[in-house]
A protein has these predicted regions:
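PLP-dependent amino-acid enzyme catalytic core
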Residues: 1-309
């Protein structure tokens, strides 16, 4: 697969470069030249393959890595992710079943394998997104919904915006995701954009980085260029009505304050006997707010990134 820059229409880059560099020479972010799309028939196949096979398939598409399911099993274990079905149509995806009891261990292990075990110190920006996409596809394949390719919502902590970006791309690739429910401990660029149609460009660089790639995925080069120009001038960015409609069709943002998180965790444990981690609690808070506002009760995949038992 070749990659483009969010800030250029002409230059293209190899997967090897994307694995070792965060940005293009013009300061842009790497984006796929053309996203693959999985048909409903292909989505149904997810439930018939192992977790490792599904992860390998997606990563091979992005990086031509020639990985196998055995490669994934060897570096991550045969069951690095487990799903726990709970009442109220909530499915918790525990992405931390490894020796470090943390998702970042699996992410680093997969990245090292992609880099031919060269023990790179830091996972690059797009590699993180691609690995999350692969994990989301593979995790969906372990759920009951995968057997009939049913839509699910995904609830998550959106602090770094890497995971929402990955979920957005997975949705565009054909993974049956209804809404991406983003919880933040405070208002941020995505919350501002969805609720106000505008956002300050004086925010943290990591938030703006995620937003640049998201805007590009919706409006292409022109929209991204306008956003970058606004950021350079440190002005308020106003999203177009069309783009705002596209965002609201797939994203929901809620503030789940640090004072609310412990009560969410305690209440969930009392009701279901399950101890969720603080990051999952932020995602669950977003799910509560979304369901209270819309009345929606679709099955929801809640992402848990570390053991909190």
């Amino acid at each position: 697969m070749l990659y483009l820059s969010t800030r250029s229409r002409t230059e293209s880059y190899t997967a090897h470069r994307v694995l070792h560099t965060d940005r293009t020479p013009d300061g842009g972010l790497f984006v796929p030249h053309q996203l693959p799309h999985f048909s409903r028939r292909e989505v149904l196949q997810l439930s018939r393959r192992t977790f490792g096979e599904n992860v390998a398939q997606i990563l091979n598409v992005f990086f031509s890595a020639k990985m196998t399911g055995w490669d994934v099993d060897f570096c991550c274990g045969r069951s690095p992710v487990k799903v726990v079905e709970l009442p109220r149509r909530v499915v918790i995806a525990e992405l931390w079943h490894n020796t470090a009891a943390s998702y970042t261990y699996m992410e680093q292990a997969l990245y090292n394998k992609l880099c031919a075990d060269q023990k790179e110190s830091m996972v690059t920006d797009w590699a993180r997104i691609a690995i999350y996409i692969a994990v989301l596809f593979a995790t969906y394949g372990t759920t009951e919904a995968a057997k009939t390719a049913d839509n699910i919502d995904i609830a998550l902590d959106a602090d770094e915006f890497i995971v929402p970006t990955a979920a957005w791309y997975a949705r565009k690739m054909g993974l049956p995701i209804g809404m991406i429910l983003c919880g933040n401990e405070d208002t941020g660029v995505v919350w501002d954009l969805l609720h106000r149609g505008e956002t300050s460009t004086a925010s943290a660089a990591s938030e703006l980085t995620g937003l640049e790639r998201l805007i590009y995925s919706i409006g292409g080069y022109e929209a991204s260029a306008a956003f970058v120009q606004t950021c350079s001038a440190r002005k308020t960015y106003h999203v177009t009505e069309e783009s705002l409609g596209d965002l609201n069709d797939g994203l929901f943002a809620a503030v789940v304050s640090s004072t609310r998180v412990p009560s969410v965790m305690e209440s969930f444990y009392r009701s279901h006997g399950y101890a969720m981690d603080p990051f999952a609690a932020i995602g669950y808070g977003a799910l509560q707010d979304y369901r209270a506002r819309t009345g929606e009760s679709r099955n929801t995949l809640l992402l848990s990134l570390s053991d909190h038992s």
